[in-house]
């Protein structure tokens, strides 16, 4: 009796009681699949062999994709590849280059066309009439008025997710690929134009339609909506090799001569001083919309001989781009670029032209 009582009293001690409960819990744990919350049992993990198999499959797929790439890339597009289609004039030949011609922006040996320093010439064997027929087939029947209004209402607003911003580079080569990428999931693309290219919106519309194969269904100041066509198939889109970097611009002849054509040195100097002290016709902003600049300059030349454009904060590079475009479109003669000011001279007029203006 005394021994039994001693064992009970010993069992009532806290240390022995804790060990007794732990042993009892270990005996009561079942081997069933039931896994209550906060249990020490961990979920079964996948065997490592399966993970290795998945990795090998992914590596095989990536190797197949690499092997499928054909280098050099062969493109059937009938036009010459340039960095910018709307902001360069192929008729004006450069007088020098800032980098060797062998450095093609498409990468070494990645294109079947020869790089001349400014363009990648298309093959003369490409049939342009076939490209025109294919474009007409993709566009299909003309859209009805209801379809056009519905399409415009979806893509003309500023919150449209399918938008491409067109900057001072104009219609660039890689932009054509961006347009086709948007056309995979959308019928049209909203294009917002800013900067120097907005001086000639007709030129932008022409190159967008010609190079992409689409059709512009909406045009409002500097906003365009480019439609892909009824029969457009993303799987049969044209092959457009990308430019890996922006090529250095070549060296062109000087835009402003020391002595303007038809004038003497003293006369050009006097006109430059008059232009700097004359009131500015317009004040242009950086990356602005210059749609009405050409018309305003033409109207001013009907009464004035010299026009000054205030291009403060625009940048000298953009000032020269503006001068080049105005020289061709107005037409006029740029005689000075100084302190972000553009001085334009209308040129010498004949007697018949003066009578018409009067």
From Swiss-Prot:
May be involved in the splicing of group IIB introns in mitochondria. The keyword Manganese does not apply. It comes from Arabidopsis thaliana. Its main location: mitochondrion. Gene3D superfamilies: YhbY-like. InterPro entries: CAF1P_plant (IPR044599), RNA-binding_CRM (IPR001890), YhbY-like_sf (IPR035920). It comes from the Eukaryota. It is found in: Mitochondrion. Keywords: Mitochondrion, mRNA processing, mRNA splicing, Repeat, Ribonucleoprotein, RNA-binding, Transit peptide. Residues 35-64 are annotated as: Disordered. Residues 141-239, 261-357 form the CRM domain. SUPFAM superfamilies: YhbY-like. GO terms for cellular component: mitochondrion; ribonucleoprotein complex. Part of large ribonucleo-protein complexes that include group IIB introns. The keyword Metal-binding does not apply. This is CRS2-associated factor 2, mitochondrial. Residues 1-28 form a transit peptide. Pfam families: CRS1_YhbY. Coiled coil: none annotated. GO terms for molecular function: RNA binding. GO terms for biological process: Group II intron splicing; mRNA processing.
């Amino acid at each position: 009796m005394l021994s039994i009582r001693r064992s009970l009293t010993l069992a009532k001690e806290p240390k022995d009681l804790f060990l007794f409960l732990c042993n009892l819990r270990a005996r009561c744990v079942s081997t069933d699949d039931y896994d209550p919350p906060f249990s020490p049992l961990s979920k079964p993990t996948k065997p490592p062999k399966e993970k290795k198999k998945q990795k090998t499959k992914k590596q095989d797929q990536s190797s197949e994709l690499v092997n499928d790439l054909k280098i050099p890339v062969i493109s059937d597009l009938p036009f010459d590849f340039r960095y910018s289609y709307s902001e360069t004039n192929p008729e004006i030949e450069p007088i020098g280059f800032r980098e060797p011609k062998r450095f093609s922006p498409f990468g070494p040996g990645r294109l079947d066309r020869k790089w001349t320093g400014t363009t990648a010439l298309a093959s003369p064997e490409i049939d342009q009439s076939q490209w025109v027929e294919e474009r007409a087939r993709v566009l299909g029947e003309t859209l009805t008025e209801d379809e056009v209004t519905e399409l415009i209402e979806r893509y003309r607003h500023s919150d449209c997710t399918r938008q491409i911003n067109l900057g001072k580079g104009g219609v660039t080569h890689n932009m054509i690929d961006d347009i086709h990428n948007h056309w995979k999931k959308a019928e049209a693309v909203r294009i917002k134009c800013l900067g120097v290219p907005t001086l000639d919106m007709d030129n932008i519309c022409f190159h967008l339609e010609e190079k992409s194969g689409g059709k512009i269904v909406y045009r409002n100041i500097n906003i365009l909506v480019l439609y892909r066509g009824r029969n457009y198939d993303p799987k049969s889109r044209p092959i457009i090799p990308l430019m890996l970097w922006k090529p250095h611009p070549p060296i062109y002849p000087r835009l402003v001569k020391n002595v303007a054509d038809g004038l003497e040195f003293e006369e050009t100097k006097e006109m430059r001083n008059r232009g700097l002290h004359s009131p500015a016709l317009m004040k242009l902003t950086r990356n602005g919309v210059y749609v009405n600049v050409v018309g305003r300059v033409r109207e001013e030349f009907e009464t004035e001989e010299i026009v000054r454009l205030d291009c403060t904060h625009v940048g000298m590079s953009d000032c020269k781009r503006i001068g080049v475009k105005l020289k061709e479109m107005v037409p006029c003669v740029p005689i000075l670029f100084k302190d972000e000011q553009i001085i334009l001279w209308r040129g010498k007029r004949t007697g018949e032209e003066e009578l018409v203006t009067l």
